């Protein structure tokens, strides 16, 4: 985990983190855990009637992968804000890859502030989720 941002420069790109490929089992387990039983995520016939070729992943499942990856880099108490938009659907077999880079770095009083660009893409580089995160570290952290 990063505690010291002194050496981080704007445009620094953190190593990517890859998540497991999306499976039907993963979607079923997430539906059970989240209570989101929308049939577009678990019923292939429903998905096909909606014009899709198969079920699609829950947007918040993809968001949870982004959050998990971010907390692997920065402790959760330092993450002050996450703002994302869902750009495209994530399909069965897609492998979510978390990307993060430094947009801005600022030191103000005893606070070290980072604005990050975050995204989830798939194995082909197609963006699924895009946004920003704000990190705040104090001199005491």
Predicted regions and their residues:
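Hydrophobic beta-strand-centered segment that forms part of the acyl-chain substrate-binding groove
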Residues: 48-57, 61-103
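Hydrophobic alpha-helical segments with strong N-terminal bias
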Residues: 7-8, 43, 67, 72, ...
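HotDog/MaoC-like acyl-thioester-processing domains
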Residues: 1-16, 91-141
